[in-house]
């Protein structure tokens, strides 16, 4: 994780956290081990934050600007403010496909990547955004069901690790778009433009399907 962070790639680094937490929790970690892990994690996070060699100034600005983006409306808070305007202006039914003023007017920078949910919400409104979240919920529930019926414990752990990553990515991206989470560069699975993200998601779903298939292998 530290090596990936040094690259620097904050979004990918954060993605490893839910895999670790889900694996330890499902693997039966006890209270004492949990406290040790939390302490070590807090020390590492504090060290990374205070060190000027790992987190870059722009990364720190991204992590803190969501608290009050209005403090820097033309800098680190610009994307969050424009995203909130896009989501709010969509209303219930949206402005229509290709008619979003924030998106088409280029007020929302690069809307097809990390802020694709804001662009979608502006054009399709609350109803469209709710439908997308419902589809994600159904996918995650199906994966959890496959984990419960897996042939062995390793298979269950693999699928639950995938569930943890996808849940984390969805929660952080949507939270980032509506101003509840910091801008970290984490994409929205199956929607954000980006080859590596799409490839990872399809590979993960393929692995989950393989685990499910092996229930029927004697």
Description of each model-found segment:
Residues 1-7, 89-93, 121, 172, ...:
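Transmembrane alpha-helix interface/packing and boundary motifs in multi-pass membrane proteins
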Residues 1-51:
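Hydrophobic alpha-helical segments of polytopic membrane proteins
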Residues 4, 45-49, 162-172:
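Alpha-helical transmembrane segments of multi-pass membrane proteins
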Residues 14-33, 101-128, 186-204:
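Interfacial segments of multi-pass membrane proteins
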Residues 21-30, 138-148, 208-213:
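Structural signal for the C-terminal ends of transmembrane alpha-helices
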Residues 36-130, 151-155:
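Hydrophobic, glycine- and aromatic-enriched re-entrant/interface helices and adjoining loop segments
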Residues 126-170:
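Hydrophobic transmembrane alpha-helices and their immediate junctions
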Residues 169-218:
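A juxtamembrane structural motif centered on a specific transmembrane helix
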């Amino acid at each position: 994780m530290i090596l990936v962070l040094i690259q620097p790639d904050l979004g990918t680094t954060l993605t490893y956290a839910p895999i670790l937490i889900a694996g330890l929790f499902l693997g039966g970690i006890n209270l004492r081990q949990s406290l040790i892990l939390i302490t070590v994690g807090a020390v590492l996070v504090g060290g990374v934050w205070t060190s000027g060699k790992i987190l870059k100034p722009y990364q720190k600005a991204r992590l803190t600007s969501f608290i009050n983006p209005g403090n820097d409306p033309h800098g680190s808070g610009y994307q969050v403010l424009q995203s909130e305007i896009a989501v709010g202006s969509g209303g219930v039914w949206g402005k229509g496909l290709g008619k979003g003023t924030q998106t088409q007017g280029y007020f929302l920078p690069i809307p097809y990547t990390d802020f694709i949910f804001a662009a979608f919400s502006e054009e399709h409104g609350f109803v469209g955004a709710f439908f997308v979240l419902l589809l994600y919920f159904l996918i995650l529930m199906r994966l959890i069901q496959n984990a419960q019926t897996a042939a062995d414990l390793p298979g269950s752990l693999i699928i639950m690790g995938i569930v943890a990553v996808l849940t984390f990515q969805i929660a952080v991206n949507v939270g980032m778009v509506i101003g509840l989470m910091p801008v970290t560069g984490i994409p929205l699975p199956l929607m954000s433009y980006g080859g590596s993200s799409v490839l990872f998601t399809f590979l993960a779903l393929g692995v989950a399907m393989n685990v499910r298939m092996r229930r029927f292998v004697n």
